[in-house]
Amino acid sequence: MIDVRAGLLSTTLRALRDVGFLEAAKKNELTFVVFHILGPSVASLDEIADISAFTADASYFLVKNFINNTTFFDWDPATYNSYFKKIKGAHEITVPKLNEMACEQVELASVPYVSFGANKGPNSEAASYSFVLRGYVKHWLGKVWAEFDRVKLLDSVVTEPQRKTARQA
């Protein structure tokens, strides 16, 4: 997993191409999945065109992350289609907005969302997080996982040999 800040995805993909990573993906030597986390700005959307040349042999997911009340150009079909329909085979994932207070408390607790929802601390010890905030987090996680299921995310990241091994176990 590689996590790059906004604006560096094209540069990172260029470097991966130059070191042979993309060629290895093309030969099925590794699984290449790109999660392109989009902001609601045109600059964020412009990067879609820039990276399309690098994602031909990848499972490519355009992720609309609703960290606030933005609309991602849903109000303007022409703008929306000019970006989101540009890349053949791209899947769109929508991460819904999480209640701000719940999100803040998860960050303050320094635990994964799943741990917060399960009322577990950083070392899996029992915690005393707010019942209501845990409820918001669990509900939000359910929506996120439903999105992953909708786009069949596991089919993109689990290779056929891994599926065979899992079936035999």
Which role fits each region the language model picked out?
Residues G7-V106:
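Conserved catalytic-core segment of NTP-binding enzymes
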Residues M1-V4:
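Conserved nucleotide-sensing/catalytic segment adjacent to the nucleotide-binding pocket
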Residues L108-A169:
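NTP-binding/hydrolysis catalytic cores, primarily Walker-type P-loop NTPases
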